[in-house]
């Protein structure tokens, strides 16, 4: 894990307890540097294997990315503590991106095998894992990642809501039932959702008749922000929207630190419905990220997608993505424990019978990044070429 995270943990605690502005400024500067220059689109951090370290600013290689699973968990911890310190949804935007991509990619879908690093590209040859493999393993000599992720997953319910005085923050969208205390009075919320596969969320007040403010996080990806920095941006012209209704009546208002505030006297049976527009988006990296020049990534909601060999009968690293691609989203409940698959038309490069370079139109299939490497060894890419010069 990048050791700056370990070093900063007591600093966050001291800053929160004492309110010392010098500590807070230092922490904020570290966070700004990470999110603005050193984080992967998957939320992974720590580019270098050597020293388990951050690299220079904008040093974000894909094939050799380290992105230790423990560092992703540390990134969640860091952003959660900074949310508690500042009350800003941007920290949960980073936390959510990390959770759904660069963190759970570190464990197999059946929970029995683990990655140490989490690269964004695989050529089927470079042995990136801690034991010089390219598949998840049941254990490692240094077993911090398996034990750390096994500890983290059961703690996830504690990140869904936050409470301060008479305010409830709805930070993550997961089906759940939660008992919360607001000034010693109990409120029970029930959340139903198909998120992250769709953007429909239903929060019901199952118990509690009292006034309080419900703060609904409106994710950055809905509002046109990949991350709260200029490290990544959307390369398409889509404008996503959202709607929030209370008992069937639409609620509007300005966002405060990324939250829509609903202040009212709540009663048992009240229902909040949230609808996020969720479509595939094309993402580009800052030009200073050399590894991603001439390439784009695809995401939908908080999920980053990748191309993997198992779904495509051509070399996925010899393709050209259209500059204005059209996407098809298909539910695949039987595939990889249930996913949404994305397809689009691309050009595959190869050689014709005369040995000349030629292209052919093919359908490219994309799967969620976290689900890769479950069907054998082979190639994978998150960042896809849009120029012939950038093809392998």
Positions of PLM-derived features:
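Carbohydrate-binding surfaces of carbohydrate-active enzymes
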Residues: 83-92, 262
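C-terminal beta-rich recognition modules with glycine/proline-rich loops and embedded aromatic residues
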Residues: 27, 93-101, 106-209, 223-246, ...
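Carboxylate/His-rich catalytic cores and anion/metal-binding grooves
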Residues: 22-37
